[in-house]
Amino acid sequence: MRRTKLYRFIVSDENLFRAIYALESFVFEPKLLSANDLVLFYRLHDKLNHTLVQDVMGQVRARLEDVLVNDELFSLRVYFNPKKLNPDTGEIESRPLHTANLVDQIAMVALLNALLFDVSDNKMILNQLALSLPPNFYGNIPSKEPKHLFVPWKEKYKEYTESVTQSYERYTETKKYSHEVTLDLVQFFPSLNPLLVYDWIIRGC
């Protein structure tokens, strides 16, 4: 594994630094970090602290070796954030929030980068998989900007609302829909077959 181009890309200084550089864009819930990790999170805001960044990169590289070479797993914690009271059952409905320690989160992003960027040319250029998302998708779009893992949601939400407004105006004028879609968001993720997605990625999208 260590000899492969993919592994060398994942543990490269460039890839690990990019993951650290985008840190503020993917740690959505800093309050879920441990006290020590929260201190580290704020210290890593200074990307020019060479000693600290090199130390963290070493820790991340060690964790990646644990996972990729020694077949260890990342440890996750789940917190349940209360959303609302179900009027029918009287039960509190919650949204699960998954988190990990800060070094593991950076390691996960370093792994994700291998799916988003062109490994073969050893350049940080978005690859075919990252670019295959359709233009009318407004979710997590991989960003070309190093400080963002994904395009900022406010920017994508603005595009989404403009598109919805235009569609509504067209309907008002023509009384015709362009599409009719029925969605069951509750069952969306359980209905995904990871093997189909994996095969699609392996075939090169």
Residues of each region from the PLM?
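Conserved two-metal-ion catalytic palm core of "right-hand" nucleic acid polymerases
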Residues: 1-205
